[in-house]
Amino acid sequence: LGLGQTGIIGRVGLTLNNFSMANLFNKNKEHRGIMPIGEGEKLSLGVQTNGQYYQSYNASYSTNWFGGKRPIQFSFGVYYSKMTDVSSNYYNQAWQNSYMNYMTGYSSYGYNYTNYENYYDPDKFLQVLGANLGWGKRLRWPDDYFTLSVQLAYTRYMLKNWRYFGLFSTGNSNNLNLTLGINRTSTDNQLFPRHGSDFSASVTVTPPWSAWDNKDYKNLATNPNSPSYVSEQQEKYKWIEYHKWKFKARTFTALTSAQKCFVLMTRIEFGLVGSYNKYKKSPFETYYM
């Protein structure tokens, strides 16, 4: 449990690190109570909420021995979240109370006149629904430290009067993407490495929807004062498109040969987001500086 400016925050999670999907419906296999165990698979369930302002639900499953014969990673996850904005009445009332308190010398401590809890606005929200499917495998070339990963993901954004994305505030948007990643890790310890390096590179791409949907994005949703602006926004961002590139490198060098010593870590990270069509840039999946 926790306490934030929007009220009480609660979080409940369950993680099983020795789960067995194969034993789930087999009563003759190993169980702990009603839970099938013994395969080293991971099952996670989570819920987080602070009442009407925010709810989040997620479930995921992963295994490092998909098929049971080779070290092949497989993962699957689903999630849903909803965030609700604060009514503009809150800011009006907060300013008025601050002004009156300044003029009269009274404090509003102990009163709920300016608490977020009193200004929940159901007409301002963001809902996110998604699922992902992942696969990974060790490589033998160029050496045994390399791994290859692939992930297919889908996310649906549902917005109403949401003012935080700038380009898009009301409507539904879909994101279907594929991520290819390669990683090389040669550190001597996962938690406190003294030697080795960790390199990773990935690219995430969506289909170039604008290449074949025959829409004039140059003149679509350009005038906020137009009566059709909201509907044009929904048409423009129904399917978002982009390509995202990431690179990360870290090296670790022990400064002495002693068992306990200082370790020098060098690090570099790079990220790039591009668009297929300069008139259809994604309001989501961007970098924030």
Region annotations inferred by a language model:
Residues 1-192:
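Gram-negative/organellar outer-membrane beta-barrel architecture
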Residues 1-7, 13-15, 165-289:
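C-terminal outer-membrane beta-barrel translocator/porin domains of Gram-negative envelope proteins
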